[in-house]
């Protein structure tokens, strides 16, 4: 496998820490050892997150093309767009963000706090669009890029989650290589890695990275899109493309992509009672904050799988914390009383 042939622009502090979740593990019976790899603490750029790791491989391409404007898309409370805005500010580039109405949640301050507030503070041109949630290339995003061209700018396209970008899976191939180095220091290997999946490139990169040592199917994706067939197809397609890029040496097959579809509801961006319980439990036992859109759902999935005995006794499970806490203030109605 050859990830090193791709240029990388450093935006993160370095390897993200692995934290034992001792109190949560004990609360769930102590038969499974839970750990978290803190991608939510990976950068000084506006709280970082998993997209910052991906953007390290997109930035060299943007600079090589002479782009002057990063153009990205997400929901109103998109973590992706906040991270793109931060990277643009860091590089001295312009930034245009399309923020679509992906979540059916009504709150008078929803489009004025959290991620979107931070993006505005960093100077991004934020454009609210009424289109609803879907996965894939969006017309509103293409129109935003054309508007930059018409104004004489040179846009660089960054799709939702970086996922439809040809280089979008590379960052989390690097995640797997980083975990292997940390495992050598820890003296053990993780039996499972749990990760939230929506647009797919985070899990896709992990699948490729862990395929290098035979653990592709030990990456357990927790769907948060509530459109699992689209998500599964996108993960598989991105993983196959990424495997070719890094010269993995074998094909990615359907069995490599494991996606648990039980925790994505009731719909994208809206939490179930189980998700809210998981968010509060993790916060109160570990002081670790997760959000109702992404990480709360993957935390719910991991907790439930432990309770149901779906991880063998003695298993060591690594939870990939991808970020998301900056969106919590947008859900203040749900968490008014904690």
From Swiss-Prot:
Reaction it catalyzes: 1-aminocyclopropane-1-carboxylate + H2O = 2-oxobutanoate + NH4(+)
GO function terms (MF aspect): 1-aminocyclopropane-1-carboxylate deaminase activity; D-cysteine desulfhydrase activity; pyridoxal phosphate binding
Cofactor: pyridoxal 5'-phosphate
One annotated GO biological process: amine catabolic process
EC category: hydrolase
Pfam families xrefs: PALP
InterPro entries found in the cross-reference section: ACCD_DCysDesulf, ACP_carboxylate_deaminase, ACP_carboxylate_deaminase_bac, TrpB-like_PALP, TrpB-like_PALP_sf
Source domain of life: Bacteria
Sorted UniProt keywords: Hydrolase, Pyridoxal phosphate
Modified residues (N6-(pyridoxal phosphate)lysine): 51
EC number: 3.5.99.7
Catalytic residues of the enzyme: 78
Function: Catalyzes a cyclopropane ring-opening reaction, the irreversible conversion of 1-aminocyclopropane-1-carboxylate (ACC) to ammonia and alpha-ketobutyrate. Allows growth on ACC as a nitrogen source.
Complex formation: Homotrimer.
The family this protein is said to belong to: Belongs to the ACC deaminase/D-cysteine desulfhydrase family.
Protein name in the entry: 1-aminocyclopropane-1-carboxylate deaminase
Organism: Burkholderia cenocepacia (strain HI2424)
Gene name tied to this protein: acdS
């Amino acid at each position: 496998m050859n990830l090193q042939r791709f240029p990388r622009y450093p935006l993160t502090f370095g390897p993200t820490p692995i934290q034992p979740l001792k109190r949560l593990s004990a609360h769930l019976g102590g038969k499974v050892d839970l750990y978290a790899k803190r991608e939510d603490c990976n950068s000084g750029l506006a709280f970082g997150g998993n997209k910052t790791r991906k953007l390290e491989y997109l930035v060299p391409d943007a600079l090589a093309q002479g782009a002057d404007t990063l153009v990205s898309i997400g929901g109103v409370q998109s973590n992706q767009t906040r991270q793109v805005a931060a990277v643009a500010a860091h590089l001295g580039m312009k930034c245009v963000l399309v923020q679509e109405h992906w979540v059916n949640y009504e709150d008078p301050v929803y489009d004025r706090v959290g991620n979107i507030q931070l993006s505005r503070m960093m100077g991004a041109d934020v454009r609210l669009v009424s289109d609803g949630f879907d996965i894939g290339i969006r017309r509103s995003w293409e129109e935003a890029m054309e508007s930059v061209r018409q104004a004489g700018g040179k846009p660089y396209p960054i799709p939702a989650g970086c996922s439809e970008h040809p280089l979008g899976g590379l960052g989390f191939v690097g995640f797997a290589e980083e975990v292997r180095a940390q495992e050598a220091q820890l003296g053990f290997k993780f039996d499972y890695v749990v990760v939230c999946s929506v647009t797919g490139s985070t899990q896709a990169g992990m699948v490729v990275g862990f395929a290098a040592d035979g653990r592709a199917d030990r990456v357990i994706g927790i769907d948060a899109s509530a459109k699992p067939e689209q998500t599964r197809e996108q993960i598989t397609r991105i993983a196959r493309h990424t495997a070719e890029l890094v010269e993995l040496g074998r094909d990615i097959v359907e069995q490599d992509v494991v996606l648990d579809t039980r925790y994505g509801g009731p719909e994208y961006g809206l939490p179930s009672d189980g998700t809210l319980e998981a968010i509060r439990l993790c916060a109160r036992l570990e002081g670790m904050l997760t959000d109702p859109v992404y990480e709360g759902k993957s935390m719910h999935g991991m907790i439930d799988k432990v309770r149901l005995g779906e991880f063998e006794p003695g298993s060591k499970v690594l939870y990939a914390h991808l970020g998301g806490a900056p969106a919590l203030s947008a859900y203040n109605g749900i968490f008014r009383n904690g």
